[in-house]
C-alpha cells in the first residue's frame, strides 16, 4: 500500500488556534505508544525504512514503512496484532505473505534480521478528523507528545495531512490553506529519523547530495521534466528541513543551494517541455537562490580576504553581515511563500502533461542548440573590460554546465568527456570570475579605510585575469562541440 501524506511543524504561537480548528466535538482522540526497531548500525534507517509496533487505542499494529518515489508518498504495510496488554515479540514471519514488504526488509537487512532490537519509543496523543475538501477526503492528524530513548527526549508537536481518497492536487491545495493560516513549515523528517538521531546522540542526519539524472528515451519531454523536478525536490526538501529546524550544518546549506539552483535552471531552460510550467517559478526560485548565493559569497570573502583587511571594523562588519544573512535565510526557508513554492513544485512533479506530444530527443537537441546559439551571440559581444557582458557570459556558461550532461545523456556519442572537459574549464573560470566580481561589488559598497583600498585593487586585477581565462575557455569549448549538427 502507498501512503500519501504531508507533515508540517507548527509555530508555538499557532498551536492553540490549530487545535481549535480541528474542533474537539468533531474529532477523535487516540493514544499512540510505539516501539521502533533497528540494528545497532542502523541498517533500516540507512535504507529509508522504519519498523515499529504501535498501540493504537486498544489494538497493537506492526507497521513497515519505506521511502517512496517522492517525499509525499511512502510504502506502508500494516499488520493488526490484536487487542493485547503489551506488544508481542517482533514477528517478521508475517511478511512471508507480503512479497514487497519482505523484499524491502531483505534489501535493507540482508542476513542481519536477527540483529533487530528496540531503539526508541514514542508516546503521542493524536487528535484526528477527516475533512472533505473539493471532493477529496483528507485526514488531519495533530500529534502532541514525545520521542524517547533511555538518555534523551524530544518534544513532538506536528500536524499531518493524509490523503484518504481523491486527488493529490487537492491534498496539496488543502494543505496550503492551513500553511497560510497557521504559518506551518514543511518537514520531511519522520519520527523514525528523529528517534534514530536521539538514539545515536546526533542532532541532524547527513546532508542529502544531488543524484545524477539521465533522460530516458522512452519518456516524453513532459514526463522527463516531471521526473527531473521530482528528483531535485528529493534533493532539496531534507536539506531545507534541517535549516528550518535550526540544526543544519554547512553542508545542508550548500546542498539546499545547489538544489535550488538546479530547480531554477530546470524551469528556466526547459520551460517549453511542459505546458504546466508557470512563468513566475523561475523568478521566484532565482530570488530565493540569490539569498543562498549572498551568504556563500560573504563566507568566501571572510575565508579569503579577512587576513588582508587591515581595519578591524571592516572585518567586524563582514562577520555581522554573515550572521544577518544566516538569520534571514533561516526565516526564508520556512516562509509561507516558499512553503507554497515547495507544494507547487511537488504537485507539478507528480503529474504528466497530457497536452504534450513532443519527442524527447528532438526537443533536447533543440534546447541544446538554443543554448549554444545564445552562448555564441554572447561571446561575440563580450570584451575583456566589459564587466557587464562578462557577467552575462558567465551566466550562459553556468546554464550550459548544468544542462549539458542532462541533454547529452540521450545522445549516442562517443568521447563526450572531451566536450565536458572543455565546458568544465570554462565553468571553473566563470565561477571564479563571478566570485571575484561579487567580492569587488561588496567591497565597493563598504566604507573602507585607506589601508584597505589595496584589497579592491587586488580583486580587480584578479577579476581581469579570470575574465581572460573565461573568454579563452569559452572559445575553446565552442570549437570542440562538433558532435551537435
What name fits each language-model region?
Residues 1-485:
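Function-determining surface determinants
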Amino acid at each position: 500500500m502507498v501512503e500519501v501524506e504531508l507533515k508540517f511543524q507548527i509555530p508555538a504561537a499557532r498551536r492553540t488556534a490549530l487545535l481549535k480548528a480541528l474542533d474537539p466535538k468533531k474529532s477523535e482522540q487516540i493514544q499512540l505508544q510505539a516501539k521502533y526497531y533497528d540494528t545497532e548500525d542502523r541498517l533500516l534507517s540507512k535504507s529509508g525504512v522504519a519498523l515499529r509496533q504501535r498501540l493504537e487505542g486498544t489494538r497493537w499494529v506492526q507497521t513497515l514503512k519505506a521511502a517512496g518515489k517522492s517525499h509525499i508518498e511512502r510504502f506502508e504495510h500494516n499488520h493488526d496484532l490484536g487487542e493485547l496488554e503489551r506488544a508481542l515479540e517482533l514477528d517478521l514471519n508475517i511478511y512471508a505473505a507480503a512479497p514487497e514488504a519482505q523484499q524491502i526488509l531483505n534489501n535493507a537487512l540482508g542476513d542481519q534480521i536477527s540483529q533487530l532490537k528496540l531503539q526508541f519509543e514514542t508516546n503521542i496523543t493524536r487528535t484526528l478528523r477527516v475533512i472533505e475538501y473539493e471532493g477529496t477526503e483528507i485526514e488531519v492528524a495533530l500529534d502532541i507528545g514525545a520521542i524517547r530513548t533511555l538518555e534523551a527526549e524530544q518534544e513532538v508537536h506536528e500536524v499531518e495531512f493524509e490523503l484518504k481518497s481523491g486527488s493529490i492536487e487537492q491534498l496539496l491545495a488543502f494543505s496550503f490553506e492551513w500553511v497560510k493560516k497557521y504559518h506551518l513549515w514543511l518537514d520531511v523528517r519522520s519520527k523514525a529519523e528523529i528517534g534514530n538521531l536521539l538514539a545515536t546522540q546526533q542532532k541532524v542526519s547527513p546532508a542529502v547530495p544531488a543524484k545524477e539524472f539521465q533522460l530516458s528515451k522512452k519518456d516524453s519531454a513532459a514526463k522527463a521534466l516531471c521526473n527531473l523536478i521530482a528528483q531535485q525536490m528529493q534533493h532539496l526538501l531534507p536539506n531545507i528541513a534541517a535549516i528550518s529546524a535550526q540544526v543544519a550544518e554547512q553542508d545542508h546549506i550548500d546542498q539546499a543551494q545547489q538544489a535550488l539552483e538546479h530547480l531554477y535552471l530546470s524551469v528556466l531552460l526547459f520551460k517549453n517541455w511542459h505546458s504546466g510550467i508557470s512563468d513566475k517559478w523561475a523568478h521566484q526560485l532565482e530570488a530565493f537562490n540569490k539569498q543562498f548565493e549572498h551568504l556563500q559569497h560573504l563566507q568566501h570573502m571572510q575565508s579569503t580576504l579577512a587576513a588582508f583587511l587591515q581595519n578591524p571594523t571592516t572585518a567586524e562588519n563582514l562577520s555581522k553581515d554573515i550572521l544577518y544573512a544566516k538569520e534571514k535565510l533561516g526565516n526564508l526557508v520556512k516562509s509561507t511563500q516558499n512553503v507554497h513554492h515547495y507544494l507547487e513544485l511537488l504537485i507539478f512533479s507528480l503529474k504528466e502533461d497530457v497536452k504534450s506530444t513532443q519527442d524527447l530527443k528532438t526537443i533536447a537537441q533543440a534546447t541544446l542548440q538554443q543554448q549554444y546559439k545564445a552562448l555564441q551571440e554572447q561571446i561575440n559581444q563580450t570584451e575583456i573590460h566589459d564587466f557587464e557582458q562578462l557577467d552575462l557570459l558567465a551566466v550562459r556558461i553556468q546554464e550550459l554546465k548544468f544542462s549539458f550532461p542532462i541533454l547529452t545523456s540521450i545522445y549516442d556519442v562517443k568521447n563526450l568527456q572531451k566536450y565536458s572537459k572543455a565546458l568544465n574549464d570554462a565553468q571553473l573560470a566563470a565561477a571564479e570570475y563571478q566570485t571575484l566580481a561579487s567580492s569587488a561589488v561588496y567591497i565597493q559598497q563598504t566604507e573602507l579605510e585607506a589601508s584597505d583600498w589595496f584589497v579592491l585593487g587586488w580583486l580587480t586585477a584578479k577579476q581581469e585575469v579570470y575574465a581572460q581565462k573565461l573568454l579563452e575557455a569559452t572559445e575553446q569549448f565552442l570549437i570542440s562541440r562538433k558532435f551537435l549538427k
